[in-house]
Curated annotation (Swiss-Prot):
The organism's place on the tree of life at top rank: Bacteria
Protein name: Ribosome-recycling factor
Gene name, Swiss-Prot/TrEMBL: frr
PANTHER family in the record: MITOCHONDRIAL RIBOSOME RECYCLING FACTOR PSEUDO 1 (PTHR20982:SF3), RIBOSOME RECYCLING FACTOR (PTHR20982)
Record-stated family: Belongs to the RRF family.
SUPFAM superfamilies found in the cross-reference section: Ribosome recycling factor, RRF (SSF55194)
Predominant location category: cytoplasm
Gene3D superfamilies linked: 3.30.1360.40, Ribosome-recycling factor (1.10.132.20)
Pfam annotation, one family: RRF
Amino acid sequence: MIDEALFEAEEKMEKAVTVAKDDLGSVRTGRANPGMFSRIVIDYYGSITPITQLASINVPEARMVIVKPYEASQLNAIETAIRNSDLGVNPSNDGSIIRISVPQLTEERRRELVKQAKSKGEDSKVTLRNIRRKAMDELGRIQKDGEAGEDEVGRAEKELDKTTAKYVHTVEELVKHKEAELMEV
């Protein structure tokens, strides 16, 4: 029972870190990268679909992105979605592809994005702590029901604390790396 609770908590923490990586990956940096478009969606025949599934996204230069829709009919919808996104870019459409020039970030915008990255990191750490709290409650229930002794539960709680600390540290490192990437000129 204890091993099950610990395994389940670690699995959930692993998923939370994966979500944190994806969230931080969507924060725009000064360089062009296909990941910055992962959160942009359009209405594609009645279903909300990420543009990454509707077009190929290439980065031929450090500050240039080319988006080539698989269906020409979706060109304008994709262009509008990119323009209306929070990326702060202005796409240009030449009839078959969309070119996006990624402007240099201003100091003010960099600081804004660092705050955004830190906020996403903090949200991830809160998620990890909530997973830990639920697992601790489960361990307490196991002890209360007499399925495990006090010593076993105590060891499991220490193990859970170590696991939580490991994943919190991972999130902190991800945020630190993103911050360095953003502040790089």
